[in-house]
A protein has these predicted regions:
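Active-site-proximal, Lys/Arg-enriched surface segment
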Residues: 31-101, 211-222
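Exposed alpha-helical structural elements
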Residues: 11-14, 25, 38-43, 175, ...
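Single, function-defining residue in the core of a domain
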Residues: 6-8, 19, 51, 65, ...
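Short, mixed-charge, low-aromatic patches
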Residues: 1-2, 81-87, 253, 257-258
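Gly/serine-rich nucleotide phosphate-binding loop at the start of the catalytic core
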Residues: 1-35
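A common structural microfeature
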Residues: 9-12, 23, 52-57, 90, ...
Length: 266
C-alpha cells in the first residue's frame, strides 16, 4: 500500500518516511526471496469463492522494447500488429472465475529467445511453464483454455500427461474427418472415417442451441493434426463470423465448451 500512496520515487528511504519501519528494515525484507506463485495462489484462494466454477487459461503477451542489451530481446508475435516484432514476450498462467468472468494471474514467465535444444520449439517452453506451475492451480480445475497457437499435438498430449484437458480453438482449415458409424462389411479392414469436415458446412453437424446470439453446432470427429478423436463445436454468430473450438470428446459438452471458451474471449 505504501508504494501506491507515497509521493516521489519508490526508494527505501522514501518508504520509511511514510511508515513506522526504518530504511534498513525495508532493505532486509526486500532482500529476501518471495515465492510469488504461492503468494498469488493464496490471494486467488481468498478472492474466488469456493462455490464458483473455475478454469485455467494460458496465453502469451508481447512487450515492446527498443533496447539492444536486454536479456531475452528478440522477435515475437505482436497480435496488435499481426506480425512478429522486436521485443519481449511473457507467458501467463491464470485462474478464471467463470461466474464473474474475471481472470487472476497465477504465474508469469519470460519466453526465451531459443529453446533448450534444437528439437524443441516455443510450444515446448509454454508446456514446460504449465507443467512446472500447474501444482498451484485449484484442485477442482481440470480444464485449460488456450488459443489456436497451442492446438498442437505436443501441447495437447503434454496436458493429458498432467491430468488436464485442453479447450482450444482450431484453424479455419483444420484437417478433420467424420467417424464412420454405418454397418461394416464382413470382409476386409473396417472403415474408420466417413469424409472430411468442411468448416462452414453444417449439414452433418448436430445443432445444440443458441447462447448469447451464437448458434452452436457440434460433432465427434478425428483431428489429423492432434492424432486423436475430439469434440468440435462450431460457433456461428449473427454477423456470420465463425469459430471452431475443441475438447476431448469424452470430457466436454458442446454448450459447456462454448461458455468456457467464451469466458476467455470476451
Amino acid at each position: 500500500m505504501g508504494l501506491i500512496c507515497l509521493r516521489g520515487r519508490a526508494t527505501y528511504a522514501n518508504l520509511s518516511r511514510y511508515s513506522e519501519l526504518s530504511e534498513k528494515t525495508y532493505l532486509r525484507w526486500f532482500g529476501k526471496k518471495l515465492d510469488f506463485i504461492e503468494f498469488n495462489r493464496l490471494g486467488i484462494q481468498e478472492i474466488i469463492p469456493a462455490t464458483h466454477a473455475k478454469i485455467a487459461a494460458l496465453d502469451a503477451s508481447f512487450m515492446e522494447k527498443s533496447g539492444k542489451k536486454m536479456d531475452g530481446l528478440g522477435k515475437f508475435y505482436n497480435s496488435k500488429q499481426s506480425k512478429a516484432e522486436k521485443g519481449l514476450e511473457i507467458s501467463i498462467l491464470a485462474v478464471v472465475d467463470i461466474d464473474y468472468n474475471t481472470a487472476y494471474q497465477l504465474s508469469t514467465r519470460q519466453t526465451p529467445i531459443q529453446a533448450k535444444n534444437a528439437e524443441e520449439t516455443r510450444v515446448h517452453e509454454y508446456l514446460r511453464h504449465f507443467k512446472e506451475d500447474c501444482h498451484a492451480l485449484p484442485k477442482d480445475v481440470r480444464y485449460l483454455v488456450t488459443d489456436a497457437y497451442y492446438s498442437k499435438q505436443t501441447f495437447t498430449h503434454g496436458l493429458l500427461e498432467c491430468g488436464y484437458h485442453q479447450i482450444g480453438k482450431l484453424r479455419c482449415d483444420a484437417n478433420l474427418r467424420y467417424l464412420f458409424t454405418g454397418q461394416q462389411k464382413p470382409k476386409g479392414r473396417h472403415k474408420r472415417y466417413d469424409g472430411k469436415l468442411i468448416i462452414g458446412d453444417i449439414s452433418r453437424l448436430d445443432f445444440v442451441g443458441e447462447h448469447n446470439g451464437v448458434k452452436l453446432y457440434t460433432a465427434i470427429v478425428n483431428c489429423v493434426n492432434l492424432k486423436r478423436t475430439i469434440r468440435v463445436v462450431y460457433l456461428l454468430k449473427k454477423n456470420r463470423r465463425r469459430g471452431v473450438i475443441f475438447n476431448r470428446y469424452r470430457t466436454g459438452r458442446a454448450h459447456t465448451l462454448s461458455v468456457l471458451q467464451g469466458t476467455l474471449s470476451e
